Amino acid sequence: MLNICHINLAKGFRGGERQTELLIKALGQQDNVSQKVIVRKDSPLVDRLSGVDAQLSLHPVSKPYLFHARHVKDCSLLHVHEAKAGQFAYLATRIYKRPYLITRRVPNPIKNNALTRRVYSGAERIVALSDAIREVLTSYDANLDPLVIPSMVSSLPVNPQASEEIRHQYRNKFLVGHAGALVNHHKGQQYIVEAAAALQQDYPQIHFLLLGRGRDEEWLKRMAAGLNNLEFLDFRENLGDFLAAFDLFVFPSLHEGLGSVLLDAMQFRLPIVASRVGGIPEIIEHGKNGLLISSGDSRALAESILYLYRNAAIRRDLAENAYQVSLNYHPHSSARRYLLLYREILSGPARMGTAAKG
């Protein structure tokens, strides 16, 4: 029996946590796998993973996290899903000698301090979500040799009646949707607001819906004051109902590891306008399954929205091609790749300071 300990100590629930959840659930459907999950007590993952699988045990923890290192004692291998988890795993393995791997989900520069370097050099393997993240990792340390395993589609549930009610509420509107944390330096929502302002007078039938919350919410709302073609709808658990109701999905990020919500939009056969940054061009080919624009360019965003609004046939072609691409990102495929990686790590020579084979 392979006993994997997943560690995610993130405070909220964003794309990385959704991907953690998807992988855990997909691994739970494999034979001879048991899983532990170490998360913060207040993490939404506690509720989302409760009762999922008889071979899954949850361990909600509070600070200081290292006091809970005993939970890794009987694990074959630790799987790190974000930065704080990496520090926890590195220190816990000094005590219990368990190997760990890291999945890196963001393209941000990695901190150049002694502890962080030890965290990465101490990992048996590093996984990147995209080639863009892989380049960040190899620039940081040429010895890391990351493996690329991309994000997964979420296969979000849809209530057809709820989706139809959304369409009815915005009848005669062309719905341009966006979903993401309202953190402008990352997701670039100010460019959606600016595009909405540019289109409002001549194209009032184009209506923008932004789903999410975050530290820049009030600032963005002040920026959008006076616009009657844009609404902020907070974070919604029923994202699938909205994706099914949208006509177009926009994602003007300033940097992005891959943008897993784009895979969800693709699965819903939505035409997409997104920034040409990070790992996004690895899943969206301009003119084939979406449109790519330069980051920070609200004019290009508005022009692309208007172009697709006017060209229904092109929207349909982009959307269908996007759906076909999304078929390559099923969680079961990622789970199988991770299982092979887990077994490769456990059957090979351990790094100095780790010894467990499970």
How would you name each of these model-derived features?
Residues 123-146, 153:
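A short, active-site helix/loop in glycosyltransferases that binds the activated sugar's phosphate group
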Residues 72, 100-128, 140:
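A conserved, positively charged/aromatic
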Residues 286-287, 291-298, 307-312, 327:
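Conserved acidic donor-binding segment of nucleotide-sugar-dependent glycosyltransferases
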Residues 3-7, 169-187, 193-196:
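Conserved donor-binding/catalytic core segment of Leloir-type glycosyltransferases
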Residues 235, 254:
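Aromatic "clamp/platform" in nucleotide-sugar-dependent glycosyltransferases that forms part
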Residues 14-25, 183-198, 215-218, 291, ...:
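A conserved mid-protein helix/loop that constitutes part of the nucleotide-sugar donor-binding site
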Residues 38-39, 271-274, 284:
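Short hydrophobic beta-strand element within catalytic cores of glycosyltransferases
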Residues 80-86:
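Short His-centered aromatic/hydrophobic patch
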